[in-house]
Amino acid sequence: MSIEEIPQGADVSIVPNKNEKKAKELIKKLGLKQIKGISRVTFKQRGNLIYAIDAPEVYRSQAGTYVVFGEAKVDDMNQRIAEAQAQQAQQEALQKAAADAGAAGDDKSPEAITADLEKASLQGGESNADAAEDDNEEVDETGINPKDIDLIVEQTRVSRGSAVKALKKHDGDMVNALMELS
């Protein structure tokens, strides 16, 4: 029987393996009582590291201690927070792009898209002409680390003069210079 053939909400029992059977028999001998209705158990460790067990089997002893069975998965809260922030930023960017597209009222017919691409390629050709002019003129590199210039030239494949201008424009900030040139 495949997964597609099992109706949703059907009562499906999983056959436990030999070790699980032995552990459950020992639990019954110890007098532990099963607690129903628990959907998730988490154990927190230093550094926002969390071990999570989804759909656990939880037993309670007379002394008040708990025994938990299930598959533990490491759940890093810092990673979850970073993912949530990235997802939120992506949603905001999509909303902003949708608002910009709606406000501009641009026609997205094939002819309009072709015209936009041609316009962009013409503008790109003009910037290439500017880059050719940058190659011919000397640029003052004082106050800028030559290794930074070399790295930007290597990463963006622009002229050395363009890299120096971008670094000076952003006060030596390599990240912003790279973003501008790429």
From Swiss-Prot:
Domain NAC-A/B stretches: 17-81
Principal location listed in the UniProt entry: cytoplasm
Pfam family, any one: NAC
Keywords (A to Z) from UniProt: Cytoplasm, Nucleus, Protein transport, Transport
Entry-linked InterPro entries: EGD2/NACA0like, NAC-like_UBA, NAC_A/B_dom_sf, Nas_poly-pep-assoc_cplx_dom
TM helices/strands, residue ranges: none
Oligomer status and interactors: Part of the nascent polypeptide-associated complex (NAC), consisting of EGD2 and EGD1. NAC associates with ribosomes via EGD1.
Main function: Component of the nascent polypeptide-associated complex (NAC), a dynamic component of the ribosomal exit tunnel, protecting the emerging polypeptides from interaction with other cytoplasmic proteins to ensure appropriate nascent protein targeting. The NAC complex also promotes mitochondrial protein import by enhancing productive ribosome interactions with the outer mitochondrial membrane and blocks the inappropriate interaction of ribosomes translating non-secretory nascent polypeptides with translocation sites in the membrane of the endoplasmic reticulum.
Similarity comment: Belongs to the NAC-alpha family.
Protein name per its UniProtKB record: Nascent polypeptide-associated complex subunit alpha
